[in-house]
Amino acid sequence: MKTIIALSYIFCLVFAQKLPGNDNSTATLCLGHHAVPNGTLVKTITNDQIEVTNATELVQSSSTGRICDSPHRILDGKNCTLIDALLGDPHCDGFQNEKWDLFVERSKAFSNCYPYDVPDYASLRSLVASSGTLEFINEGFNWTGVTQSGGSYTCKRGSVNSFFSRLNWLYESESKYPVLNVTMPNNGKFDKLYIWGVHHPSTDKEQTNLYVRASGRVTVSTKRSQQTVIPNIGSRPWVRGLSSRISIYWTIVKPGDILLINSIGNLIAPRGYFKIRTGKSSIMRSDAPIGICSSECITPNGSIPNDKPFQNVNKITYGACPRYVKQNTLKLATGMRNVPEKQTRGIFGAIAGFIENGWEGMVDGWYGFRHQNSEGTGQAADLKSTQAAVDQINGKLNRLIEKTNEKFHQIEKEFSEVEGRIQDLEKYVEDTKIDLWSYNAELLVALENQHTIDLTDSEMNKLFEKTRKQLRENAEDMGNGCFKIYHKCDNACIGSIRNGTYDHDVYRDEALNNRFQIKGVELKSGYKDWILWISFAISCFLLCVVLLGFIMWACQKGNIRCNICI
């Protein structure tokens, strides 16, 4: 019987303990941070997957599907390649003297004049594209003794046989083709680009009919360079009804230099020069439509925003563009470590601090306070610590963009078959650069994410230490991010703790008295629920055992009779 009384006393004593915050003479204050039900996984240096409350995607993986016409000046090549427009193919006459920032070549572009080849096509195309203009100046070359302005049925202007408008086809006059020696000085202050060519007849008869001599020769010289080309007579695959060809060459004449042209036949002469400008214009092959919009960055797939530091839309770009990487996604943490709030808090539903979990629903700040006191419960954000974290995180994205956005363009590389090894080397270099940047991007983002998480954890710890130093012995650290305050602390008192104006000395005596007046054993919150349930179960079990023993003893003494009927 004494055992029953003792256990009952313990049982009642345990349940009689006053819950934190329910006693008018105490209060509970917890510190916590923002949490969301479903966070975002990011990568850090130490963890491949860590959940944060918020993250920003750093890789632009889609385009607008169209090329914006602003702020760059876009010139749509339509049916013309840049070289056809340069030479003056009849169906490209509309491009004469045009200017551009980006010349867009279409896959449907075609040549519609005399068949030609350019031995150094890529260099000429790149040179003219970067110049950004087809401005042409005619010059008065003196071609005495030959017939000028030859034409062909394969190159019609309207219904008339014609030729490239920027070139002058010279052939025999009265069965004569004298030796040609023509000079043209550059008295300007800019570089001049001269385009000229050599005609390769398909037969010896065609050669003599046009140029009298059985073999021609063309030499073009400046003080710095000399090119000599001997025609190759012979049949070639038929193109637009012709098996003969023209080879296109080009010469740059510097200011103060002289252009010298010497020929005994087969010369396709220049009519003048193109002004060469130094600039950042370029060319791009694309079939994306040109639209009325604005974008600094253009790819063959279309324009893309440049508000992200990386993109994997296309390696070829023009303008201020994000750096190309292989990854489809790289997420930058812009929030703190996410620890979703527990839905239940034991049998008491008690509040808990940041050590155990975050708080959902705290929309006005990243860090804050929850309290229980005689006036009820409440929650408020700490704006100062929130702002300190936000200020440091906000600049991360802008800094990444500044580090990675290219202020130049990555143009297409073209090489002839003879330059195959150079092309392979160029491809290897470009692929290596992309691999390095992809690795660097992943490492950079992981470092920034690690710093963000460490930073936000640090701000939480700073706020906790600041609160602990204010309360001192007036409160006890409960070990879960909460303090049990041993004096009456109304909402005004709680507010003073939050804003840093709490006066420890005012409450010191009351707190000390309340500490000593607490009765019974105060169990730690982490084990209280378990101990209460275990105590209750043991008490019930022992009570049943004692009751059963009493019944059996009474039956033996005859004080109780038990009849079992079947």
Swiss-Prot record:
Assembly behavior: Homotrimer of disulfide-linked HA1-HA2.
Record-linked InterPro entries: Capsid_hemagglutn, Hemagglutn_HA1_a/b_dom_sf, Hemagglutn_influenz_A, Hemagglutn_influenz_A/B
Cell cycle in keyword set: no
Role played: Binds to sialic acid-containing receptors on the cell surface, bringing about the attachment of the virus particle to the cell. This attachment induces virion internalization either through clathrin-dependent endocytosis or through clathrin- and caveolin-independent pathway. Plays a major role in the determination of host range restriction and virulence. Class I viral fusion protein. Responsible for penetration of the virus into the cell cytoplasm by mediating the fusion of the membrane of the endocytosed virus particle with the endosomal membrane.
Protein's name in the database: Hemagglutinin
Disulfide bridge map: 30-482, 68-293, 80-92, 113-155, 297-321, 489-493
Extracellular side: 17-530
Membrane topology, from the record: Single-pass type I membrane protein
Entry GO MF terms: host cell surface receptor binding
Positions of transmembrane segments: 531-551
General remark: Major glycoprotein, comprises over 80% of the envelope proteins present in virus particle. The extent of infection into host organism is determined by HA. Influenza viruses bud from the apical surface of polarized epithelial cells (e.g. bronchial epithelial cells) into lumen of lungs and are therefore usually pneumotropic. The reason is that HA is cleaved by tryptase clara which is restricted to lungs. However, HAs of H5 and H7 pantropic avian viruses subtypes can be cleaved by furin and subtilisin-type enzymes, allowing the virus to grow in other organs than lungs.
A single Gene Ontology CC term: membrane
Record keywords: Clathrin- and caveolin-independent endocytosis of virus by host, Clathrin-mediated endocytosis of virus by host, Disulfide bond, Fusion of virus membrane with host endosomal membrane, Fusion of virus membrane with host membrane, Glycoprotein, Hemagglutinin, Host cell membrane, Host membrane, Host-virus interaction, Lipoprotein, Membrane, Palmitate, Signal, Transmembrane, Transmembrane helix, Viral attachment to host cell, Viral envelope protein, Viral penetration into host cytoplasm, Virion, Virus endocytosis by host, Virus entry into host cell
Lipid-modified sites (S-palmitoyl cysteine): 555, 562, 565
Lipid metabolism keyword on record: no
GO biological process, one term: clathrin-dependent endocytosis of virus by host cell
Pfam family, one: Hemagglutinin
Glycan-modified residues: 24, 38, 54, 79, 142, 181, 301, 499
Signal peptide bounds: 1-16
Predominant place of localization: virion
Localization: Virion membrane; Host apical cell membrane
Protein family (similarity comment): Belongs to the influenza viruses hemagglutinin family.
Residue intervals annotated with topology Cytoplasmic: 552-566
Site note Cleavage, residues: 345-346
